[in-house]
Amino acid sequence: MNAKPSFPMSLARICLSATAVAALIGLSSPSFAQSPASGSPPKLNDRRPFLAPGARTSEDPVRIPMRPVAEDGPELVIRGGRLFDAVSGDTRLATVVVQGNRIKAVLPPDATGWAPDAHIIDAAGKTVMPGLIDMHTHVTYPDRSSPFDEQGSEGAGTLRGQRNLRYFLESGFTSVRDLNGVSNAPFLLSQWSAAGMIPAPRVFAAGWIITGTGGHATERPSIPSHGPEYAKEVDGPDAWRGMVRKAFKGGASVIKIASHFAPDEVRAAIEEAHLLGLKVTCDCETIYTEMAVDAGIDMIEHPLPRSDAAIATMAKKKIAAVPTLQVYQNLLDRAGGFYGSTSRRFTMTSQGNFDEFKKMKAAGIVMGVGTDTIGDASLMVPNSYIAELKWFVRGGYSRIDALKAATIVNARLLDMGDELGSIEAGKLADIIVVDGRPDENLDDLAKVEEVIKDGQWLIRDGELVTPRHVSTPLVKPSPPADVK
């Protein structure tokens, strides 16, 4: 797990100069298009060879990054805590120094010599670890308190998402991958978080879900969350390509598709997304999972029924999974099982889904941690996430490996393993301080006291702290100088 991912950097992370942009315009021509040979899975389009030597890449999940945090502010020193090394799984006493939005150094616990204006966090007896990452959220989804006539509203969804993102931040999450929401609300939240306009984790947004007519997330069209503001129904390869492009235009960091679809449709969607530099994840089951893995999907969501052959193909092609075990345990245990969205001839059960997880674990499939926070589930963090980690342990993971999955593994699946997921000099400063030892007791993850996201100390002693607004100086003409 120590090696960096082999897949190329997403276009969403490339900061281009005007010259580089001009050079990249030609990529749409046939001579540059990386269309796969017939029958072979499409590969991600790596634009890095076209950049000028030494060109910087962005640090946020937006194609045109916002101005980075200034690097001339006071240092933030997290002193003498138990540092959880998410790469090795070891813990050791250390002091972490943050400058601007990056980790400046990881030093011995008794290191000294800070500037007089340095901010000091005394982490003695506490665990210092990378910020948590949730790989499957729906922060703009309505909950039971949402009025029915507001559930399809982009404005209401944006406000609801801002509230839910605060809950995630307070719980120690510094990144979430949001896999379906109302209209453009997830894109707005992603942009606002990246710009520092709202206190929130980084948001890697899919925007909406793409499916065939009558497919998943459209089963109950009378409900707003199963309507066109949340799910886009398309038919035919060209329509699937077009919807991928629309999501890209809106600001997607990832593409989410769902069954049902035809083989040529799923292949077209994956090919188009990969040409744009985006990865694709799929919510699917049975034969649709086989179609997706054969077409070159990057990831499969949920522990839904799939054949042993599909699992073997996932392992061979290094296709990852995000099993979302806890939410399915709740859903299936309460109902005793339910029918798949594309067939009423079989039911899914909690034990059957857990068996799928264990098969994937045995096959060596890399699995990320996500909660599938639909409805009131956003109100249940961090308990829902801790429960998810416990299911990982029940399925064969050690506590250490579960925490690695929650941090560095998730970061690598986001194509951000070089910037997030571990506390190392030079990486972005996404750090939490936990009053306990989560590597020994996962329940201690509920005791997050400090959260630093992008170098900003946002949660202090468990409370959200936002800087006071500083008025911008007036432009000329100035007000009357002789008036007091």
What are the functions of these language-model segments?
Residues 58-75, 83, 88-129:
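Histidine-rich, glycine-flanked metal-binding segment
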Residues 81, 428-469:
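C-terminal cap of metal-dependent C-N hydrolases
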Residues 143-146, 186, 290-296, 325-340, ...:
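Histidine/acidic-residue-rich catalytic or RNA/ligand-binding cores of hydrolases
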Residues 126-192, 213-217, 221-223, 292-295:
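Metal-associated gating/positioning segment near the N- to mid-region
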Residues 160-186, 200-207, 250-259, 279, ...:
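Divalent metal-dependent hydrolysis catalytic cores, especially in the metallo-beta-lactamase
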